A protein has these predicted regions:
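A composition-driven surface/loop motif
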Residues: 1-190
């Protein structure tokens, strides 16, 4: 079991990154809890893998300190691959921000906690979702926030089952303009 927290106010880093790696990070199991904050910076990150992040199993929970102006739970400038496990990511701005994404399995929750967040899940350049259950939630019910954004989104063998509309999907942005159903869920087709 691993618990990771950014340092206290006296010695906190400027960027406020709880777990950072330049190279590839692979998580195959275990219980990992990351609580992130930044004392001297308006933005903080929970798990920041510059090159590549691969999750094959385990129970991963990433949660910000609610005093932040901006907080991104999971971010990678390269490839994000999720094959299994349970991954719960909370952010005040973006919950998940990745350049290339492939989700083939597991149970993934991305949730924005701040009403003023303009996005929940940014799978920026290309995203392919082929399995698992992927829930994207705007906890504060902001009707203007983009729940899922991708310039190239592929859903193969999975369905969007809640909270999205065809117009926004066509624009590669999945929105939900309403307060009754502030989330979308993508899961494997039966």
């Amino acid at each position: 079991d691993t618990y990771i927290k950014t340092a206290d106010e006296e010695v906190a880093s400027f960027m406020g990154v709880a777990l950072w790696t330049q190279d590839k990070m692979i998580i195959n199991g275990g219980d990992i809890a990351i609580h992130y904050t930044a004392s001297f910076s308006p933005i903080s990150y929970g798990l920041y893998s510059v090159s590549e992040l691969e999750i094959n199993g385990g129970n991963i929970h990433i949660n910000p300190d609610d005093s932040q102006l901006m907080a991104v739970g999971l971010i990678t400038s390269g490839q994000l691959t999720i094959n299994g496990g349970k991954v719960s990511v909370y952010g005040l701005d973006d919950a998940i921000n990745a350049k290339f994404t492939h989700i083939a399995g597991g149970e993934v929750l991305a949730q924005a906690l701040d009403y003023f967040a303009d996005g929940v899940c940014r799978l920026v350049t290309k995203a392919e979702i082929t399995g698992g259950v992927f829930t994207i939630s705007d906890m504060q019910h902001n009707p203007k926030s983009v729940k899922l954004f991708s310039n190239d989104l592929h859903l193969n063998g999975v369905s969007i089952v809640a909270g999205a509309n065809e117009t926004s999907v066509a624009k590669k942005e999945i929105n939900n303009y309403g307060y009754t159903d502030p989330y979308i869920r993508i899961e494997k087709e039966e």
